[in-house]
Amino acid sequence: MLQMLPVEPHLEVRKRLPQSASRRPPLLFVHGGYCDAWFWEPYFLPWFAARGYPAYALSLRGHGASGGSDTLFMAGLGDYEADVERIAATIDSPPVLIGHSMGAAIVERIMAKRPVRGAALLAPIPPAGLLPIASRLATSHPDYLMHMGGVDPSRMSANVLQALRPFYFGPHVAPKILAEAARHLNAESSRALFDLSLRLHWALPQRNHSPLFVLGAEGDVICTPDDVRATAAHHKVKATILPGLAHMLMLEPDWAHAAKALEGFLATLE
């Protein structure tokens, strides 16, 4: 018998709130594939909260401390989209949606269906989907896909971690951050990855002209600067590409460069 996904699994939410009342918009951060809400915790959540932005990050179903790990393989982008919408509805006022990589694709799907207060796509999956990325990496770095296909947090070896590091981080990432990131790696839904391969995040272009910011990293070998520019062109905006950062730009030593660029966009919404 086909097992249906639970309608509302428990979802982990991490938050940092300003110390005093603020009129600045709340922010809802959406993590990328294989990750969870922790990836925003070391730097972005406290940094934005200190500047008056109520900052929230959720773990999608089957990730982090959220429920649904037993049915993760059945979860598609539509299920992740529902998770984001459910948490957004619990926040006092409409949040700005900020997605990283796969999380950016989820934000794009939401933008295609309704106006949002504002949105930021960080290192987004390009309009062409995952297949060109996978093809490029299979040619240039064939070991990458082998390692990613077998990501199992319970059996994450030092060798696998070392093999994946150059794809996600720059050479100077703090060892403590790298070790903690490895602890928060999750298995990813094969259905969600299939959805990204079919470009299901792209099928409905934005029609409501919500304020949008697209940010990429010069050192990103997963979602390259050209990939990021393709996403920006699709939405008829200009991409911002920052030097000195890699794919996990929110955890890099120079993470503040990305945070300040994002803050500049947020200032236009006030």
Give names to the regions the model predicted.
Residues H31-D36, S101, E218:
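Active-site glycine-rich loops that stabilize anionic/oxyanionic intermediates
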Residues W47-S69:
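Conserved alpha/beta-hydrolase
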Residues V221-A230:
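Conserved alpha/beta-hydrolase "acid-adjacent" motif
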Residues K238-E270:
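Catalytic active-site module of serine/aspartate enzymes centered on a nucleophile-bearing elbow/loop
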Residues G33-L45:
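The serine-hydrolase catalytic nucleophile loop
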Residues A65-P95:
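Active-site loop/oxyanion-hole signature of alpha/beta-hydrolase fold enzymes
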Residues P115-G150, A192-L196:
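Flexible "cap/lid" loop of the alpha/beta hydrolase fold
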Residues N208, V214-G216:
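Short beta-strand/loop motif that positions the catalytic acidic residue
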